[in-house]
Amino acid sequence: MIVKEYGKSNKDIIMLLHGGGLSWWNYEEVSEILKSNYHVILPILDGHSGSDRDFTSIESNANEIIEYIDNNYNGNVKLIGGLSLGAQILLDILSKRDNICEYAIIESALVCPMKMTNRLIELLINMSYGLINKKWFSKLQFKS
């Protein structure tokens, strides 16, 4: 897993998980603001622009983040925030380790299965997945 870091290493740690089709740069502006008071960690989720591997599952990303926090921050950080896909990964993290962070911000997580749209979503993902690694497409999506 590749991570971007902002701020001094002796500060409270905030980890922000970007949404699908986005990447670490989604939080670049807010990280510049937070870095004077916090150490900000921005993991690049698997399969997204700048990552070192293909996306496999929410669970594997969650396990990788738990391992990263265990290995680098003694198993606990101040806050983890997640947007969309990042929020779903965060929910999986919290279901496995509810004490991994003092605070959690969950934005736009899919928490109730939508059975009727699963087939449509699968088709659309298969058609558009190649665009997820294109930075120009991610930035265009972010602007909307």
Where are these regions (language model features)?
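Structural signature of beta-strand start/N-cap positions in the alpha/beta core
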Residues: 13, 39, 77-79, 102-103
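Active-site signature of alpha/beta-hydrolase-fold catalytic machinery across serine-
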Residues: 29, 92-96
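Flexible "cap/lid" loop of the alpha/beta hydrolase fold
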Residues: 95, 101-132
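Gly/Ala-rich beta-loop-alpha elbow adjacent to hydrolase catalytic centers
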Residues: 82-90
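Active-site micro-motifs of SAM-dependent methyltransferase domains
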Residues: 22, 47, 87, 111-112
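Active-site loop/oxyanion-hole signature of alpha/beta-hydrolase fold enzymes
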Residues: 41-81
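Conserved HGGG/HGGXW glycine-rich cap/lid loop of the alpha/beta-hydrolase fold
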Residues: 6-52
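Helix-loop "lid/cap" segments that line or gate small-molecule binding pockets
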Residues: 109, 136-144
